[in-house]
């Protein structure tokens, strides 16, 4: 499969990390503990990469960042839904690695080491203010949106670092977050979470 910038994907995303609420990394401040351990998940509700349909597939990215996110190199592992066929797997890898341009090309500039790209059984659920992800044998993450005035979502807009730069980010709290792979092991709860819809496209 050749690299193309003729693509667009839409869906929902969420993440959790070890930072206190709200994670200061999105404001280009240092992580709460000096390092950030984050797992980010996306569910593609509709998508197409140069003719390859991507509807209904999940993707996740685990990252270890030993300092301010824009000042140090990230160590990352990418997970692609095992239901993806060969063409879909290649398309999603090109998109989320930044090779196909768009938002992830900018994110890729911060990556210093890719420790793995693999397919895995993934279960992503979005219901109301709750989000959950299971990567079989590797990770489990569950967050719940926090209530603002009159129960409305608490949101962050126009933050300089964002997984989805053109959508308000809903602030959430983790109920559970475990990850174990590539020599990294995290077991957290009661920490930061974010979620929002997303639309990404090539240049």
What are these model-derived regions, one by one?
Residues 25, 61-66, 120-124:
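Short amphipathic beta-strand and strand-loop transition segments with alternating hydrophobic
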